[in-house]
């Protein structure tokens, strides 16, 4: 079967290429239905990655957040028409200690390997997770980002001290919003505070215990643990504030991505006995557990729906460009592509 793949060939320039798909191989053929644009996709689209990185990784199909529909499974494991969420991380080996998303041998879609902007995607059976029949597929298209937050929380749970009466989340964007939803559900007895820069964005966090602008944090405010969801240049200020307001032996989960090194007040880190926990991406088990949360707590999906900024019906290559350009100017939320091309 001939498949069309829509690749970024240079910043802001897409082209279509073709590949031959063996539908009778040991894989599942999935038709993407809804895709969601990530900040990492935008760094490629706008050319904000290092020039050597762009030269090495392009041309490449973008987007690693998507849901789709099974169109063919030669093994018969999944029925035709089954709605699934696709897992972008693809391991080539298993390790009894190291998680699949930290193995150097794993590859990740839309990061040096083609993402989900294709007519059909060839997926291994363990790289798709079936979804409930009545779920909102448009909202669930950004499940990958939910799984990233969930994975970070699980790492935090395993590595932190038992005292968990209060959490601080630095970052009022998409990742901060999702992390706040999950922390409120997984730790219902704990206080959850969100720290951000924009009143408009902070107004969406009505379900947490309190919100603060980063330049008006009370001096006496203390938290047990923190989640840094800022990224970029703001990571340094966020970490500075976290280290100042976190209690002794607290843990700091680092989720924000910065292209440049950031300074950390190691004197206070040592003095307070703090633990910094790095986290990146997620694996198939995280996706499975997130979908289980959707089933158990439908209100999670309702809150996630408020994160959707725009939904673009993509019928042509120009629609793809329009979607990425619109996403750049979006002040809040995720841009979803209804994939009808």
From Swiss-Prot:
Superkingdom field: Bacteria
One GO BP annotation of this record: poly(ribitol phosphate) teichoic acid biosynthetic process
Cofactor(s), names only, from the UniProt record: Zn(2+)
One Pfam family here: ADH_zinc_N
Entry's EC annotation: 1.1.1.405
Pathway assigned to this chain's UniProt record: Cell wall biogenesis; poly(ribitol phosphate) teichoic acid biosynthesis
Keyword GTP-binding: no
Transmembrane segments annotated in the record for this chain: none
One MF annotation (Gene Ontology) recorded for this entry: ribitol-5-phosphate 2-dehydrogenase [(NAD(P)+] activity
Reaction catalyzed: D-ribitol 5-phosphate + NADP(+) = D-ribulose 5-phosphate + NADPH + H(+)
Residues where Zn(2+) binds: 38, 64-65, 144
Signal peptide as annotated in the record: none
UniProt keyword annotations, A-Z: Cell wall biogenesis/degradation, Metal-binding, NADP, Oxidoreductase, Teichoic acid biosynthesis, Zinc
Complex formation: Heterodimer together with TarI.
Family per record: Belongs to the zinc-containing alcohol dehydrogenase family.
Job description of the protein: Catalyzes the NADPH dependent reduction of D-ribulose 5-phosphate to D-ribitol 5-phosphate.
This protein's name: Ribulose-5-phosphate reductase 2
């Amino acid at each position: 079967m001939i498949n069309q793949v829509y690749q970024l060939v240079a910043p802001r320039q897409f082209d279509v290429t073709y590949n031959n798909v063996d539908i009778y191989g040991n894989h599942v053929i999935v038709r993407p239905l809804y895709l969601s644009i990530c900040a990492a996709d935008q760094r490629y689209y706008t050319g904000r990655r290092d020039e050597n990185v762009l030269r090495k990784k392009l041309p490449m199909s973008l987007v690693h957040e998507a849901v789709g529909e099974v169109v063919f499974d030669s093994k018969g494991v999944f029925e035709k028409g089954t709605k699934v969420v696709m897992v972008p991380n693809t391991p080539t080996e298993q390790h009894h200690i190291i998680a699949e998303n930290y193995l150097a041998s794993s590859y990740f879609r839309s990061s040096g390997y083609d993402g989900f902007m294709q007519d059909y995607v060839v997926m291994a059976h363990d790289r798709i997770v079936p979804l409930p029949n009545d779920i909102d597929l448009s909202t669930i298209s950004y499940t990958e980002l939910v799984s990233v937050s969930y994975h970070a929380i699980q790492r935090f749970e395993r590595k932190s001290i038992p005292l968990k009466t209060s959490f601080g989340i630095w970052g009022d964007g998409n990742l901060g919003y999702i992390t706040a939803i999950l922390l409120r559900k997984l730790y219902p007895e704990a206080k959850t505070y969100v720290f951000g820069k924009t009143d408009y964005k902070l107004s969406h966090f009505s379900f947490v215990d309190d919100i603060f602008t980063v330049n008006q944090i009370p001096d006496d405010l203390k938290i047990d643990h923190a989640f840094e969801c800022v990224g970029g240049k703001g990571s340094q200020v966020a970490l500075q504030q976290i280290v100042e307001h976190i209690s002794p032996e607290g843990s700091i989960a680092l989720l924000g991505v910065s292209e440049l090194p950031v300074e950390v007040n190691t004197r206070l880190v040592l003095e307070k006995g703090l633990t910094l926990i790095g986290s990146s991406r997620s694996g198939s088990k995280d996706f499975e557990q997130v979908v289980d949360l959707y089933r158990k707590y439908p209100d999670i999906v309702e809150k996630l729906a408020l994160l959707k900024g725009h939904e673009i019906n993509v019928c042509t290559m120009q629609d793809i460009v329009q979607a990425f350009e619109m996403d750049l100017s979006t002040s809040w939320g995720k841009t979803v592509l209804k994939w009808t091309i």
